[in-house]
């Protein structure tokens, strides 16, 4: 399987690391059992028919394995994969070039597909449904449309904000799956597997400690493993033991629930500066010095999952659990005010 990255700048060391530990087969993919079981059936059926797999929409918080699964889909279907992202496809011509270069059975992976410009998104409709695109030649009175056939392909779209997808685009995906956060025991398995690939030992106790603070996210678990490896190597150790793991986590200011400095800053701001909320995300972003999109896509999902934050029509509100933990006692009364128990994101 050939992997082609298109207009996706990334750190070379990060790419090499991801390639080292990324599973290449469905059997090696840990977690998301119902999702992968269904995909096995869909892929097998498509191969029996000799068809391209239906287009696949993968949604969920970042770092749960959407890109990895897109690569596995291409591998299982015996095709190549071309990787790009919504913001990079700023012109319809860029998308047309990609589509016409695909061969039968190839996978086009578009990350952050919810950020596709409207004109480019509309260009996808006929490609997804009829495997054709219409290209305009010339301009003005002499302009004419030329229809080009493209090879049957599979579009895999990934999004952290499925609610921003338009209905016409969403309806064209034959397969739609959502990723869930991972339980600690599965993250521990991922850490043990990755440590073997990286050539560093890790004790079960250390792996469990790292897994428990990884916010249910494999990408974070692997990142913490890399940092623990750094501490182990500086200590001239070939094994990450419990002491090294704890030193790593303490140095990175990651607490027993996986909250980092920015998580705590967000909650402290809501609880103590805005009296528990509600507060608009734009005001919150200015207060903590972070981008609004980053708060919504990176920090909020886990804070909601952990039971500290609730989204309401009026803004973000701290839950009772958050008030108990983060209140400084300056005017916050956990028995009064617009407080919420832990609630899922809306």
Swiss-Prot record:
**UniProt binding sites for Mg(2+):** 67
Residue ranges for the region (Small ATPAse domain (RuvB-S)) are: 183-253
* Top-level EC class as recorded in UniProt: hydrolase
Any idea which UniProt keywords this protein has? ATP-binding, Cytoplasm, DNA damage, DNA recombination, DNA repair, DNA-binding, Hydrolase, Nucleotide-binding
Keyword DNA damage (UniProt)? yes
The places in or outside the cell where this protein is found are:
Cytoplasm
Per the record, what are the reactions this protein catalyses?
ATP + H2O = ADP + phosphate + H(+)
Query: What Enzyme Commission number(s) does the record list for this chain?
Result: 3.6.4.-
Q: Which domain of life is it from?
A: Bacteria
Residue positions binding DNA: 311, 316
Record SMART domains: AAA (SM00382)
Listed Pfam families = AAA_lid_4, RuvB_C, RuvB_N
Cite the GO molecular-function annotations of the record: ATP binding; ATP hydrolysis activity; four-way junction DNA binding; four-way junction helicase activity
- Please list where the region (Large ATPase domain (RuvB-L)) is annotated: 1-182
Q: Which positions in this protein are listed as binding ATP?
A: 21-22, 63, 66-68, 129-131, 172, 182, 219
Q: Where is this region: Head domain (RuvB-H)?
A: 256-346
GO BP terms: namely:
DNA recombination; DNA repair
Gene Ontology CC, one term? cytoplasm
Annotated domain remarks: Has 3 domains, the large (RuvB-L) and small ATPase (RuvB-S) domains and the C-terminal head (RuvB-H) domain. The head domain binds DNA, while the ATPase domains jointly bind ATP, ADP or are empty depending on the state of the subunit in the translocation cycle. During a single DNA translocation step the structure of each domain remains the same, but their relative positions change.
Q: Which family does it belong to?
A: Belongs to the RuvB family.
PANTHER family per record: HOLLIDAY JUNCTION BRANCH MIGRATION COMPLEX SUBUNIT RUVB, PTHR42848
Q: How does it assemble?
A: Homohexamer. Forms an RuvA(8)-RuvB(12)-Holliday junction (HJ) complex. HJ DNA is sandwiched between 2 RuvA tetramers; dsDNA enters through RuvA and exits via RuvB. An RuvB hexamer assembles on each DNA strand where it exits the tetramer. Each RuvB hexamer is contacted by two RuvA subunits (via domain III) on 2 adjacent RuvB subunits; this complex drives branch migration. In the full resolvosome a probable DNA-RuvA(4)-RuvB(12)-RuvC(2) complex forms which resolves the HJ.
What's its job? The RuvA-RuvB-RuvC complex processes Holliday junction (HJ) DNA during genetic recombination and DNA repair, while the RuvA-RuvB complex plays an important role in the rescue of blocked DNA replication forks via replication fork reversal (RFR). RuvA specifically binds to HJ cruciform DNA, conferring on it an open structure. The RuvB hexamer acts as an ATP-dependent pump, pulling dsDNA into and through the RuvAB complex. RuvB forms 2 homohexamers on either side of HJ DNA bound by 1 or 2 RuvA tetramers; 4 subunits per hexamer contact DNA at a time.
**Listed name of the protein:** Holliday junction branch migration complex subunit RuvB
Task: Cite the source lineage.
Answer: Bacteria, Pseudomonadati, Chlorobiota, Chlorobiia, Chlorobiales
Its gene is ruvB
